[in-house]
């Protein structure tokens, strides 16, 4: 599987056994100004995340691109 991976946000081949791509997003103090924080990576399983953290898992090549947000102003 090939997944987008941060910080470079480029598609990379995942290590053996990690066949899922996931996009994890969450807010910090500057969320309303800068938008959500984003982590893109490979995984063996879709992780369980704490409250207020969003995660999307998928299993096809390059299926988890960097999310786009509406302009916040």
From Swiss-Prot:
InterPro entries: Snake_3FTx (IPR003571), Snake_toxin-like_sf (IPR045860), Toxin_cobra-type (IPR054131). Disulfide bonds join 3-21, 14-42, 27-31, 46-57, 58-63. The keyword Lipid metabolism does not apply. Expressed by the venom gland. Transmembrane segments: none annotated. Keywords: Acetylcholine receptor inhibiting toxin, Disulfide bond, Ion channel impairing toxin, Neurotoxin, Postsynaptic neurotoxin, Secreted, Toxin. One of its GO terms (cellular component) is extracellular region. CDD domains: TFP_snake_toxin. Belongs to the three-finger toxin family. Long-chain subfamily. Type II alpha-neurotoxin sub-subfamily. Binds with high affinity to muscular (alpha-1/CHRNA1) and neuronal (alpha-7/CHRNA7) nicotinic acetylcholine receptor (nAChR) and inhibits acetylcholine from binding to the receptor, thereby impairing neuromuscular and neuronal transmission. This is Long neurotoxin 3. It comes from Ophiophagus hannah (King cobra).
């Amino acid at each position: 599987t090939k997944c987008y991976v941060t910080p470079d946000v480029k598609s990379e081949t995942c290590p053996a056994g990690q066949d899922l791509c996931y996009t994890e997003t969450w807010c910090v103090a500057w969320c309303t100004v800068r938008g959500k924080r984003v982590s893109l990576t490979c995984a063996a399983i879709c992780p369980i995340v704490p409250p207020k953290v969003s995660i999307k898992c998928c299993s096809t090549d390059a299926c988890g691109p960097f999310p786009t947000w509406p302009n916040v102003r």
